[in-house]
A protein has these predicted regions:
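Aromatic/hydrophobic pocket-lining residues that form π-stacking "cages" and hydrophobic walls in ligand
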Residues: 98, 150, 189, 230, ...
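Short aromatic-enriched loop/helix-cap "lid" or pocket-rim segments at secondary-structure transitions
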Residues: 39-41, 123-125, 173-178, 213-214, ...
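Mobile, glycine-enriched helix-loop/loop "lid" segments at the mouths of ligand-binding/catalytic clefts
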Residues: 174-200
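C-terminal substrate-binding subdomain of Rossmann-fold SDR/epimerase-dehydratase oxidoreductases
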Residues: 193-316
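N-terminal Rossmann-like NAD(P)+-binding domain of SDR-like oxidoreductases, especially those catalyzing
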Residues: 1-165
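Short-chain dehydrogenase/reductase
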Residues: 80, 88, 136-144, 167, 179-187, 216-217, 241-244
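Flexible, glycine-rich beta-alpha linker
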Residues: 119-120, 137-138, 162-183, 208
Length: 316
């Protein structure tokens, strides 16, 4: 099977692309390399450099493909609040271009990279796929709109579609695949440490056990495995949505405790104001994906943070 992976040179996309290739899939990487890195795709021959908002480029990249895994997107929550037009243009407009190209090139399978940011704030112990969606940020709104587009166009066109709602992704399979975004908590801490600064905790006054946000963390390699099983499921699945997390919540302070253990340092974090668009608590219920796809995460929090730090130390 020939699979187009948009955003395939990104942090998550590279892990997904390599796993697909290891499992016998023919992979075409589509990336504009604005955030993706060439070093992550050095073992791929079929690379299409293009912008997801360029309809003609997307159409050309679709030639000869059997399925799509769509990860290409802008993803900084704070930036989406200050510049929502950029996010709607790129994330929703790009998804529209992709669906149009699929229709024109008779490609009828897609796995979409969605987000837990689509959900309404919740006090539930674990969020289920059927729970209310009312995103706090434009980023989350673009993911929800893209899900809806994929579902509705899929129904009209006869596509098989699955949207995977990621929770917080961390870790790395190898050095060159590490997360360089600096928007996510763990790489942001690494950057502050290397610069000799105290890392920040954004908000210590949330209604949680220690005042900091609670999040569900998943190892990026476990997430890549979820894409693989979702792709296989497209042979029978018509229109699916699945949470992808560990099913366990960790506070930001607990993450800092593990970071200090893995890095063997004292980080001395300082508390700052809340970031706009952040929910107090987001923990996944993963019962549906366990039942329907037979997928379960494997990595512990220690393994996630250890692998992230190993990649950070080895990065050039």
């Amino acid at each position: 099977m020939k699979v187009l992976v948009t955003g395939g040179a990104g942090y998550i996309g590279a892990h997904v692309s390599e796993l697909l290739q290891e499992n016998g899939y023919s992979v075409r990487i589509f990336d504009d390399f604005s955030n993706g890195l060439e070093r992550r795709v050095k073992n791929f021959k079929d690379i299409f450099e293009g912008d997801i908002t360029d309809r003609e480029a997307v159409l050309k990249s679709m030639e000869g493909m059997d399925a799509v895994i769509h990860l290409a997107a802008k993803k900084a929550v704070g930036e989406s609040v200050s510049n929502p037009l950029k996010y709607y243009t790129n994330n929703v407009g790009g998804t529209m271009n992709l669906l149009a190209a699929m229709s024109l090139k008779n490609v009828n399978k897609i796995v979409f990279s969605s987000s837990a940011a689509v959900y309404s704030p919740s006090e539930k112990d674990a969020i289920e796929e059927s729970d209310p969606t009312d995103p706090l940020s434009p980023y989350g709104a673009t993911k929800l709109l893209s899900e809806q587009l994929i579902s509705k166009v899929g129904q009209a066109e006869g596509f098989s579609t699955i949207s995977l709602r990621y929770f917080n992704v961390v870790g790395s399979k190898k050095v060159e695949f590490g997360d360089n975004s600096r928007d996510n908590l763990v790489p942001k801490v690494f950057a502050a440490f290397k610069e000799g600064k105290s890392p920040e905790i954004y908000g210590a006054d949330y209604p949680t056990k220690d005042g900091t946000c609670i999040r569900d963390y998943i190892h990026v390699q476990d997430l890549a495995e979820a894409h693989l099983v979702a792709l296989k499921q497209l042979d029978t699945e018509v229109d699916g949505v699945y949470n992808v997390g560990s099913g366990t919540g960790y506070s930001v302070k607990e993450i800092f405790d593990q970071l200090e253990e893995s890095m063997a340092v004292k980080l001395n974090p300082v508390s700052s104001a809340r970031r706009p668009g952040d929910s107090p608590k987001l923990i996944a219920s993963i019962k549906k994906i366990e039942k329907d796809l037979g997928w379960r995460p494997k990595a512990t929090l220690k393994e996630m943070i250890d692998s992230a730090w190993a990649a950070e130390k080895g990065a050039k």
